[in-house]
Every structure is written in structure tokens, then in C-alpha cells.
Amino acid sequence: MSRIRKAPAGILGFPVAPFNTQGKLEEEALFQNIEFLLNEGLEAIFIACGSGEFQSLSQKEYEQMVEVAVSAAGGKVPVYTGVGGNLSTALDWAQLSEKKGADGYLILPPYLVHGEQEGLYQYAKTIIESTDLNAILYQRDNAVLSVEQIKRLTECEQLVGVKDGVGNMDLNINLVYTIGDRLGWLNGMPMAEVTMPAYLPIGFHSYSSAISNYIPHISRMFYDALKNGNDELVKELYRHVILPINDIRKQRKGYAVSLIKAGMEIMGLNVRNTARPPVGPVEKDHYQQLEAILKQAADRFPKKAATV
């Protein structure tokens, strides 16, 4: 099968896993939420990754999420899945992703182990070469590969991009100027809008947007202003929306996931403020703070009506 070997660019959607109060995955809610992201113009769907509580999913739930995402996307945008953890499971889920019609996968770090560079290279290479799907390498935590190792991985045609979740700008600049446009470069830092002004000038033209799950027009407004040099609007969005939400996110471990769900619930989307342990729900005070920020954002930065 001939595939387009190119990483998605722009604002990337990372849907959450909507659980009901009994902790069961709600497929219809997931479908609706992905449709919402697509209608808002997000350029790709990354399903069952960090925001989708990858680490908590059973194989059946993972399969359900991939099926829903592929169905909802309908070929309009590429669908990437999360694969990683222990190598055997990563390979199984990579095969499953290919079988279910995904376009690629994001390679998450191995479980617990801190390997040497050669081991991390072999881990990534084994997963990359296990299918014909496109692969994006996630630089994070215990799996941060050097320029030399990533350059070796570019020999695999399936590798199309690198997502940075570390924030080592010295390494990022070295990567971009050594490897160039052979790969797509994705900003995957928590609340990526905060750091995107530093990433865009060095060649990172994509980012994973948490807030796009509930205020996608703000994320779009921000990115357009950033690209077009509208510094005043960027500052206003920072001051009134992005930094205040980020301040709440930093209050508790796990809020990178659960704060998204709280935001979606506040905005009337079909998601509850529930997450699986060890991630906890957003606490009442923080929930109310987020509610106030979103109300102010809606008043100050209203969504433009769609033109017919």
C-alpha cells in the first residue's frame, strides 16, 4: 500500500476517553467529541494517547477507541493511535491499529525502564518497522533519544515525525537543523500554547492542543495570531485564557488529563469530570476557577458565526 509519508501539521486533536460514573467507556460520546474536533478544523486525530488515558485502557477499550476514531474521521484527516509501554503490547497494538485502518501511531515511552540510547533506538525501531503505518516518535520522560539515534531512525521510511514533550530547546534546535524537513516536528509540551512562540520559529509547525477539546476557536485564534505576527492578540489570549488555565493545570498531578474533561463538561460537551486512578477529577475550587475563566473567554473572545 502506498502511503503519504508526512506528519500532520497544524493543530492536532487528542480526544479524551469519556467514562461514565461507573468507569465504562462511552463510545457515542467519543464519536461526538471527535466530530466536534473535526468540525472545528483540527488537522489530525490522535486517539488513545496520553489525553486518552492510554495507560488505563484494556485491549478491548483500546480497540473500541480506534474503531470509533477511524469511523468518525472517515478519511477526512489522519488518525494516529498511541502505542508503547512494554514492547510486546506495543507491537500487538501497532498491528491492531493497522488492522483497524489507522494511518499511523505515536510511539510512547517504554514502561518504567530507563534504557541506554542503543536500547531506546532498538525499542523505537522495532515498533516502527513492525507495520507499514506512519510513526511519530514521542520524546518524553524515560525515552529521550539523541540526535544521532533519531538520525539513524530516519532510515526507516515509516518514521515521519518527532513530538517533543521534554522542552530541551538545545536538543530541539540541533534536531531540526541536523535532520531538517525529513521529519515533521510537533510540540507536545503540556499546554503547548504556552511554549509555541518558542517552538514555531525553529521549525515546529504542529502542536497538540489540550484546550482545543473544549475551546478550539481559542486555540485556532491563538495559532493564527502567532503565525501572522499579531502580537497584541497573542498577549491578550495569554493574559486572559492560556496562562490562567495553565496555572490551574499545574496545581495537581494528573490535571493534564482531568482538566480537559472538566473544561469539556463546563462547555456542555458529552464528557464527565471523571478519570481513572491514579488520575483524579478536578477539585471543586479549581473547577469553579476554570468555569470563570471560560465564561470570561466566551465574552471577551466570542466564536465567530460560521459563514454559509
From Swiss-Prot:
Keywords per UniProt: Lyase
Pathway: Carbohydrate acid metabolism; D-glucarate degradation; 2,5-dioxopentanoate from D-glucarate: step 2/2
The EC number(s) this enzyme carries: 4.2.1.41
Highest taxon of source: Bacteria
GO biological process, one term: D-glucarate catabolic process
The keyword Lyase belongs to this UniProt entry's keyword annotation: yes
Catalytic activity field: 5-dehydro-4-deoxy-D-glucarate + H(+) = 2,5-dioxopentanoate + CO2 + H2O
Gene3D superfamilies associated with the record: Aldolase class I
CDD domains: KDGDH
GO molecular-function terms, A-Z: 4-hydroxy-tetrahydrodipicolinate synthase activity; 5-dehydro-4-deoxyglucarate dehydratase activity
SUPFAM superfamilies linked to this entry: Aldolase
Xref: HAMAP family: KDGDH
Family: Belongs to the DapA family.
Name of the protein: Probable 5-dehydro-4-deoxyglucarate dehydratase
Organism whose genome encodes this protein: Bacillus subtilis (strain 168)
Gene name in the database record: ycbC
